[in-house]
UniProtKB/Swiss-Prot annotation:
Post-translational modification: N-myristoylation at Gly-2 mediates the recruitment to lipid droplets and plasma membrane. Acetylation at Lys-168 prevents AIFM2 ubiquitination and degradation, thereby inhibiting ferroptosis. KAT2B mediates acetylation at Lys-168, while HDAC3 removes it.
Protein name according to UniProt: Ferroptosis suppressor protein 1
Known outcome of mutating residue 174 to R: Impairs the NADH oxidoreductase activity. Impairs mitochondria to nucleus translocation. Confers protection to doxorubicin-induced cytotoxicity
Lipid-substituted positions (N-myristoyl glycine): 2
Organism: Mus musculus (Mouse)
This protein's encoding gene: Aifm2
Modified residues (N6-acetyllysine): 168
Length: 373
């Protein structure tokens, strides 16, 4: 798809809402094809949040995880918050009154969750980087740290802390017994547990934090008491929450109320078109596809959405998206990891080479056609 589109693009203007992994992949492809587009995001920089947890333990790392949109997309980027979509007039409505017309719309709004795993604030690049540098200082001050939530973010967070600061006491509290994501092979989930135990992480499984709302988050305190529903009490200096990921649906919720899945994702057909709309696509976390929410999948969705916009312009058949066997790599600190590729177990060496060392940062800088600092 590297050559430019030869049909008349005068009537075509694609608006992409959300500049996460799916959004920048779609924007880069449209730019290469010379298809008119506008990318909208409330931040001024792409956040490579796959590496967010390392940025919260290693000073100087965060600057590699934020990449300027305007340096890549120039006038095809608009910083702003989308507050609604006018389907009748084909307009994306921004806070402040601006309206962006579209012939085709790609919704790539992603998901939100607690800092440091996600950073979803209206912010400039410098302030975002500083938020992670401040987090590093809080972790460095704390001898005892509790991580709440044993999904992939929680286990990676605990592993990153123990890799960078092996002398710290880290306790991971998880409401279930198996760790990481339920779609993973049982042997992968077991290896996650063994890696954490080898690193010296204390595991409190099948327990739920009962006083979470009262606890300070991401800040050093001389004494914090964490209580669980089983009556366990843990004394700590710092609490990091790594659960509660939600789909970012506020931009489109009112326009597509009848097209929403129970979690707020958009119901799509096999071509990733929002049900009932041939010119509107949903990709990444906000698409209701039967697969885990991952950056890798968002990129695959972007390929299909862009191909289908081009195919529709050329009156060609549309391309269907077919989820494959699961590829999922868990980085457990820079020297360790485990996962599966196309449904098959892969161990430490492969994951370390493929992901753990640089957490795929170079891939995002390449997509954005910029050089890392």
């Amino acid at each position: 798809m590297g050559s430019q589109v030869s049909v008349d693009t005068g009537a075509v203007h694609v608006v992409i809402v959300g500049g996460g992994f799916g959004g920048i992949a779609a924007a880069s492809q449209l730019q290469a094809l010379n298809v008119p587009f506008m990318l909208v995001d409330m931040k001024d920089s792409f956040h490579h949040n796959v590496a967010a947890l390392r940025a919260s333990v290693e000073s100087g790392f965060a600057k590699k995880t934020f990449i300027s949109y305007s340096a890549t997309f120039k006038d095809n980027f608009r910083q702003g918050k989308v507050i609604g979509i006018d389907l009748k007039n084909r307009m994306v409505l921004l806070q402040g009154g601006e309206a962006l017309p579209f012939s085709h719309l790609i919704l790539a709004t992603g998901s939100t969750g607690p800092f440091p795993g996600k950073f979803n604030e209206v912010s400039c690049q410098q302030a975002a980087i500083q938020a992670y540098e401040d987090m590093v200082k809080q972790i460095q001050r704390s001898q005892f740290i509790v991580v709440v939530g044993g999904g992939s973010a929680g286990v990676e967070m605990a592993a990153e802390i123990k890799t960078e600061y092996p002398e710290k006491e880290v306790t991971l509290i998880h409401s279930r017994v198996p760790l990481a994501d339920k779609e993973l092979l049982p042997c992968v989930r077991q290896e996650v547990k063994e890696i954490l135990l080898r690193k010296g992480v204390q595991l409190l499984l099948s327990e739920r934090v009962s006083n979470l709302e009262e606890l300070p988050r991401n800040e050093y305190r001389e004494y914090i008491k964490v209580e669980t529903d089983k009556g366990t009490e843990v004394a700590t200096n710092m609490v990091i929450v790594c659960n509660g990921i939600k789909i970012n649906s506020s931009a489109y919720r009112s326009a597509f109320e009848s097209r929403l899945a129970s979690n707020g994702a958009l119901k799509v057909n096999e071509f990733l078109q929002v049900e009932g709309y041939s010119n509107i696509y949903a990709i990444g976390d906000c698409a209701d596809t039967k697969e885990p929410k991952m950056a890798y999948h968002a990129g695959l969705h972007a390929n299909v959405a862009v191909a289908n916009i081009v195919n529709s312009m050329k009156q060609r058949p549309l391309k269907a998206y077919k989820p494959g066997a699961l590829t999922f790599l868990l980085s457990m600190g820079r020297n360790d990891g485990v996962g599966q590729i196309s449904g098959f177990y892969v161990g430490r060496l492969m994951v370390r080479l493929a992901k753990s060392r640089d957490l795929l940062i170079s891939t995002s800088w390449k997509t954005m056609r910029q050089s890392p600092p």
